[in-house]
Amino acid sequence: MAKEDRIEMQGEVLENLPNATFRVKLENGHVVLGYISGKMRMHYIRILPGDKVTVEMTPYDLSRARIIFRAK
């Protein structure tokens, strides 16, 4: 899938779930299941509840999102 097909949104982590997944509330109010991107895993970037994150979603499954950036 081309990068242009991805939807980027801002959100806030609500809770940690098993297997490095998170419940993320998007700025439009929807709650999705987020998982960490590979580069964030590789560099051991920790995500805690309350963190502001940027997520990337595919138009085919709007209930899951990849966390690609954690704001400071």
UniProtKB/Swiss-Prot annotation:
Keyword Ion transport: no
The keyword Oxidoreductase is assigned to this record: no
Assembly information from the UniProt record: Component of the 30S ribosomal translation pre-initiation complex which assembles on the 30S ribosome in the order IF-2 and IF-3, IF-1 and N-formylmethionyl-tRNA(fMet); mRNA recruitment can occur at any time during PIC assembly.
Source organism: Methylobacillus flagellatus (strain ATCC 51484 / DSM 6875 / VKM B-1610 / KT)
One Pfam family hit: eIF-1a
UniProt similarity note: Belongs to the IF-1 family.
Subcellular location: Cytoplasm
Protein's recorded name: Translation initiation factor IF-1 1
Organismal lineage: Bacteria, Pseudomonadati, Pseudomonadota, Betaproteobacteria, Nitrosomonadales
Residue span(s) of domain S1-like: 1-72
A GO-annotated cellular component: cytosol
Stored InterPro entries: NA-bd_OB-fold, RNA-binding_domain_S1_IF1, TIF_IF1
Keywords noted in UniProt: Cytoplasm, Initiation factor, Protein biosynthesis, RNA-binding, rRNA-binding
GO terms of molecular function: ribosome binding; rRNA binding; translation initiation factor activity
Annotated function: One of the essential components for the initiation of protein synthesis. Stabilizes the binding of IF-2 and IF-3 on the 30S subunit to which N-formylmethionyl-tRNA(fMet) subsequently binds. Helps modulate mRNA selection, yielding the 30S pre-initiation complex (PIC). Upon addition of the 50S ribosomal subunit IF-1, IF-2 and IF-3 are released leaving the mature 70S translation initiation complex.
